[in-house]
Structures are given as structure tokens and as C-alpha cells.
Amino acid sequence: MRISVSVVASNVVVDNDLISLDVGGEMTLADLKAVIQSDINIAPAAQSLFHNNQLLTDDSKTLSQIGVVPGDMLGMHIRVPGRELAGSQGSANPSARTTQESLARRQQALPDPETLRLHMLGDPRVYETVRMQNPQLAAAARDSRLFREVLSAQQRAEADAEAAKEAKIAMLNADPFNLDAQREIEDIIRQNAVSENLHNAMEFSPEVFGRVTMLYIPAEVNSHKVKAFVDSGAQVTIMSPECAAACNIMHLVDRRYSGVAKGVGTASILGRVHLAHIKIDDLFLPCSFTVMEGKHIDLLLGLDMLKRYQACIDLKDNVLRIRDRNVPFLHEADLPKHQDEFANEPLIHGRGGALIGGRTGAVTHPAGNPGSLAQNAQTLPARANLAAPVGTPSSSTAPGRNPHSPSRWPAESISKITDIGFTREQAIQALDAANGDLEGAIGYLI
């Protein structure tokens, strides 16, 4: 089985603070420490291992007896005798010393700022990606002196944040048997695992950060051309009131079927058109439409229509197969105009500096700071075609808001969101991003 060992505190420098090991359930704790020694050259006597906030003291127990299962992460404190004095001598200003060391490491890893600036200006793809991730740095690219100042300021801010994190870990490890401290250490270990998972996704599966276009086909209803959204997750076929009026079938709406649709939010159902013909390719197919407000989509082909005519969504050939006809899905350039709104959708400031799309929920800038954007610029040509860039400058801050400040949105909408467990501030931010659309606001928050 594979487990991980995270070095959460150490009075010596180790080559790797996160170790992945293949071990057996019958391996003893002493054997595990020997394996760790072979990886990072730390003697077993200096290793203190923790599992589920419990210090492991019996080296004769096997991993199975301890309760270690595949995928577990153990915490490890390293205390090498004779090193505490050296550490205390330099502890007069540990935060400043750590900041300087971190800044020096970053500067060594980065190329010369002028080389980096010229690289950005020489490759439009790199410049555009940096502009989306770090507008301040991109805006300074035309001025060599200003670029150097902005880059240095961002590096110092990142180094300060890293130093503060290391200082917090050191403070927590000052009392390793404090339960509250151990809970915080466990949370730090979890966050490190999340960051590692993000980096692995960026390296091995960058396509997961891309933007997927929805499936539309050309159709006609009552001789009116419409772009129909194919949605096998919808129970019924839905049409907007505007589209029904344009198709001249609004007078056929049976309002006895009106009501409220509940799901992620609510929408008003005006009624039902029991029978109308929809033209797909050269086929004229009888269809019923539920006329519903609150949707950006003119026509949505639901499961009732798809199952009735045994339609097949073929993603390999990018076609909808229906009655022996192959109807190609529309290309991105041919999608309805309202889809363009998502390209310039408003952004909401999340925790840790994350920027999140107010409508799609796509994370434009992940929380935290996995690395300097300037440092990542060297690898941007390989990722320049990604729709959703990754990384964010540490200077991103969420604007403050008084939780009881007046809002331009109806109190009823805010109340509906707060009733399901969110704060008033979150409700107002979500409504701002969704331009007052209650369903979109709830969808983002969920």
C-alpha cells in the first residue's frame, strides 16, 4: 500500500518534506523509520511519527496494528540532538531570517527580471496569460524599472507569507501534545496535500482546467430558427417565453400546467404547449414544450424528447444521432450570444485570494499561492492554450463589506439564500455576481 509522510517540523534542513512510500501492512514502525532514513538521511532516533494526532511510540508494532490504511498520511517531527543551540542563536529575529532565506531561494530560482520581461513581450501567448493571472505585473512589462520593482514587491510578499506560515508551524510544534495545535497541524497537512494534488493536475492533466462548451444543435420551431441546447440531465423539454413568442406559439400555452420548478433555486413555469413540431435536420418531430421563465437558454431538449426518439449523444463524432440522422453539434463560434457572457463573467473573491466565476463557478485564480506567476512564466508556453489559468499573485485581496450594509437586491432574495445556511454577505456577493438572478446566485454558492 502507498502512504505519505509529511515533515511538519524539523530543526535541520531536509531534502523533501513530503515522502511517498510503498509499504506493507506487516512492516513494523522501526522498519518504516529505516525506510525513511534511506530517503532523507535522518536517523530513526530523531524521528517522531504521528498518526491521527497520536504519537507512535512502540516501534515493534506493525502498521496494520497501528491502523494505517492505504492513502494515509503520517506526520513527522525531526529533532536532531545538538542542533537546538544553533537554531536558538539565530532566533533573535526568526521571521526576518526565514523571509530572507525564502526570498533568496526564489530569486535564485527565477531568471533575471529583464530576461523574464523580454520573454513576456516576445511571446504574445505568454503575455496574455500573465495579463489574466497577474494584471499588475503585465501592466509594468513596458517599463524595465517598474517591472523590476513590481516583481520584487510580489516576491517579498510571497516570502513574507511563507515565513509567516513556517513561523506558525514552529509555534504549533512547540507543544506537540496540545490537541488544538495538533488539529491545526493536521489541517496544514491536508492543505499541503490539496496543493500537491493541484500541482499534479497542472502537470499531468492540464486539460481539466479547460472550458468545455455546451452541446447545441440547429433546429426550427414553427419556421423560426433556434439553437437548441441538448441536455440529457433535464427531465422535460423547456422553452423560454421569449422564444415561444418568437415561434408564435405563446397563444397555445396551457396555463393550467403553471407552477414553480424547484431545484438549485426556483423558476416560474408559465404553462405547457402540448404539441408543436420541431425540425431537426430534415425531420419534423412532434414535441411538447414546458414554458419556463428564468432561463438564459431559448430551447432545451430534455430527456423526454431524447428518449422518445431514441437519440444518441455521440461525443466521439460530436454529433446527435436521431432517427438515422447525424446532426453535428454547433462549434463554439456558433453558440448563442449569451454564452459570451461567461467569457467576461463577474468574478467573486473567495477565501485565500481565490477568484471564482460568478456564473460558471470556474476558478480563475486558485486560492493560496502555489508559486510565483513570474516563475511560472517560463512554463507558460506549454500551457498558454488553457482556458482557465492557474496561480494568483499574493497581492490579491478580497474587498471588505459590511455584512449589514444596504443592498440593491430584494430582501426576499437575500432571505431565501440565508435561509439555506449562507451569510448575508455571501448572499449579496452572489447576487451581485449573478446580476440579481436568484437561481444563479444559489448555484454559485452551492
Swiss-Prot record:
Name of the protein described by the UniProt record: DNA damage-inducible protein 1
Quaternary state and interactors: Binds ubiquitin and polyubiquitinated proteins.
Gene: DDI1
Its EC number(s): 3.4.23.-
Record's keyword terms, sorted: Aspartyl protease, Cytoplasm, Hydrolase, Protease, Protein transport, Transport
SMART domains the record matches: UBA (SM00165), UBQ (SM00213)
GO cellular component, one term: cytoplasm
GO biological process, one term: protein transport
Similarity section: Belongs to the DDI1 family.
Region Disordered: start-end pairs: 387-412
Keyword field contains Hydrolase: yes
Pfam families, sorted: Asp_protease, Ddi2_HDD, UBA, ubiquitin
Domain of life where this protein originates: Eukaryota
Summary of the function given for this chain in its UniProt record: Probable aspartic protease. May be involved in the regulation of exocytosis. Acts as a linker between the 19S proteasome and polyubiquitinated proteins via UBA domain interactions with ubiquitin for their subsequent degradation. Required for S-phase checkpoint control.
Subcellular location: Cytoplasm
Domain UBA span(s) in chain numbering: 408-446
Classification via CDD domains: RP_DDI, Ubl_Ddi1_like
Annotated ranges, domain Ubiquitin-like: 1-83
Species annotation: Coccidioides immitis (strain RS) (Valley fever fungus)
Highest classification ranks of the organism: Eukaryota, Fungi, Dikarya, Ascomycota, Pezizomycotina
Catalytic residues as annotated in Swiss-Prot or TrEMBL: 231
Single annotated GO MF: aspartic-type endopeptidase activity
